Amino acid sequence: MYRSEHILKGLSNQYYRATYKSMGFTTEDLKRPIIGIANAWSECVPGHYNLRQVAQRVKDGIYRAGGTPIEFGVIGGCDGMGQGHDGMHFIMPSRELIANSIESMAQINLFDGLVLLGSCDKIVPGMLMAAARLDIPCIFLPGGPMEGGVEFDGRQAEQTSSTEAYGMLSAGKITEEEYVSLENTACPGCGSCSYLGTANTMCALAEALGMTLPDGGTAPATSAVRMMKAEETGVKIMELVEKNITARQIITDGAVRNAIKACLAMSGSTNAVMHLTAIAYEAELGIKVLNEFDTLSDTTPQLAKMNPACKYSIVDFYKDGGVPRLMENLQSMLETDVMTVTAHTLAENIRDHKYLYPATGLVNHTLDDPFGYTGGVAVLRGNLAPDTGITKPGAFDKSLHHFKGEAICFDSEEAAEEAILAGKVHDGHVVVIRYEEIGRAHV
């Protein structure tokens, strides 16, 4: 019996059917499995700007496979837009709001399955947290990464290039004309930021976790593959519903360990530590994510490298095989018997994957030829971080792995930015920003 039949089947449930029919749903529509589509589309976030089109293709797939899609909206704030002002204090709590609102809508409407559409920093983990709480068939699908912009300072430009350019302008290294020109060429189209920040890390890790279809985590926002993956997602959610493969059958201790290893191997965002911790918490798992990062970092090599660690973008990573290639190269270190949203195991996905592009070896390396012999994310302990701190050694030069300098402390992000722009931060300083904690999020 489908969950939705509790309110849509039988003479006594006419009220619910009449309510849906007021919006044009037919009797036949309401006899099918009801699939919720949680869509974080907005004009506030470039990573979500294409999600209207993505949602339509997901709906096409659901209809084709015998289901009825019902779409609802989800908030989604851009971390970049919140930086440098009080708005940043609202970013982390939004993750919990997203998880709570999706859980609420799914339970109010008794959806039989969920497709989760979002791309950016707090939206991806918030959606995966909701899936883990609900434990119904779910697939997460991002809108895909933005392609790189004009060549600037040795790599394809993106949003952070504008920040760097302001410093270069202040130092007299570029002209005002060059600076203004970059504003129009740094971001050539929609998508999540083209570097490996939190957004693309979490999209890639959703795929490594098994909650996104292969290549669904990193295919570009403007690509045909993105739309193909959307329709395939619509078809596949129906298979998960029919087979009753739920989120907690996929989000297991082994799957989370695989995602941790993928994060270490690609030198992903340090924020992945707290997000994977929260996802594991919502799935009621026993795994201690921070301890696993600490232990596995010593034995997991860095196999992928991209901006900000080098000039290659997340789209270059995708074209060099993306997450499927990374997981294939890591296969001997992974728990490959875990279930995924393909309704097959990770081992079967690796075995059957068809790559669209020939391997270049520029971004994805093998175990025999790693970028580094330890993970690209590390756990720190010491007097500055008695409860641990997280760093990303895979993204900066090895000469900085040991550094001694004078600490210059600020009590807010705004104060630090003001001092930097006023020329008060110099070579040899270690910038410390206090009191910007994440509050009561599950970490």
Residue ranges and their predicted role:
Residues 91-100:
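Glycine-rich, highly charged phosphate/nucleotide-binding loops
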